[in-house]
């Protein structure tokens, strides 16, 4: 017959807090999982946060720069196509371009001045976003860390203002087109006009990102002097873990020691009797 090998299994039961009055409570606990940032120093965490803010600020600057270049590139082109109903003649015009035909609008301002208001809001939008980009580029070149807290808020506000002005510009241009082509012509907006809407969306998106970057930069900095109390969880993940302070645990221990001393003394006293 083959001899069966006897295997000995040992289980590790670490010391855990005990419930008062229950000596059989032996639920093993293990430390909770640590976050990767818990082992980092406060200086390293702050350095990573500053680097992330710089990357986000660069993204906002790139969006605004791309939108501005696209806006400037579309401005000298035609935005609308006119079709004369009587003879089928096609005419083209834009915000800054005018056709020489008598049916097109002229350079002379006429009420309700939709075209002039549209041009004014276009210029305000361009100059506003140029101001924000100038602040961003100056912060990158000079590397001024003192103004970074309010820089994101300023860029966000300028992006929203520029997007609002561009929105008014596009709506006023459409109003000018509808007013000019009442009965004699039909109008059709070209792809160059719709690309300006993409620039407006990018301005809004950059403003939202910059605002979120400003809100996250206002979070309190890490303090190395703050003591962190480690947490414990059940190994099985079921039920709460009771924590008993050493001061409270001394009472049950002293009672248990006194009971054990009495039990030892009782047999001795019986011998004397």
From Swiss-Prot:
InterPro entries (UniProt xref): PMP-22/EMP/MP20-like (IPR050579)
Keywords: Membrane, Transmembrane, Transmembrane helix
Region (Disordered): 242-273
A GO cellular component annotation in the UniProt record: plasma membrane
Regions crossing the membrane: 53-75, 121-141, 155-175, 189-209
Principal location listed in the UniProt entry: membrane
Membrane-related topology note: Multi-pass membrane protein
Feature: compositional bias, Basic and acidic residues: 247-266
Bridged cysteine pairs (disulfide): none
Annotated localization: Membrane
Domain of life: Eukaryota
PANTHER family: EPITHELIAL MEMBRANE PROTEIN-RELATED, TRANSMEMBRANE PROTEIN 202
Stated name of the protein: Transmembrane protein 202
Primary gene name: TMEM202
């Amino acid at each position: 017959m083959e001899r069966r090998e006897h295997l000995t299994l040992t289980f590790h039961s670490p010391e855990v807090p005990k419930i008062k009055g229950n000596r059989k409570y032996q639920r093993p606990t293990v430390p909770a999982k640590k976050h990767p940032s818990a082992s980092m120093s406060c200086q390293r965490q702050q350095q990573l946060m500053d680097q992330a803010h710089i990357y986000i600020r660069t993204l906002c600057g790139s969006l605004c720069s791309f939108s501005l270049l696209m806006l400037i590139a579309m401005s000298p082109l035609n935005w609308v196509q006119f079709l004369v109903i009587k003879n089928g003649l096609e005419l083209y015009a834009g915000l800054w371009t005018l056709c020489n035909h008598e049916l097109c609008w002229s350079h002379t301002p006429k009420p309700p001045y939709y075209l002039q208001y549209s041009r004014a809001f276009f210029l305000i939008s361009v100059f506003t976003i140029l101001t924000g980009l100038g602040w961003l580029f100056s912060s990158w070149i000079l590397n001024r860390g003192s103004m970074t807290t309010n820089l994101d808020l300023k860029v966000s506000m300028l992006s929203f203002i520029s997007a609002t002005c561009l929105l008014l510009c596009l709506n006023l241009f459409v109003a000018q087109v509808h007013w000019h082509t009442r009965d004699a012509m039909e109008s059709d907006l070209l792809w160059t006009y719709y690309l300006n809407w993409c620039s407006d969306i990018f301005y809004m998106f950059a403003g939202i990102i910059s605002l979120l970057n400003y809100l996250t930069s206002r979070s309190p900095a890490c303090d190395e002097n703050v003591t962190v109390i480690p947490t414990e969880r059940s190994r099985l993940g079921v039920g709460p873990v009771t924590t008993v302070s050493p001061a409270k645990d001394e009472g049950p221990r002293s009672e248990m020691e006194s009971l054990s001393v009495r039990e030892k003394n009782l047999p001795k006293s019986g011998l004397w009797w």
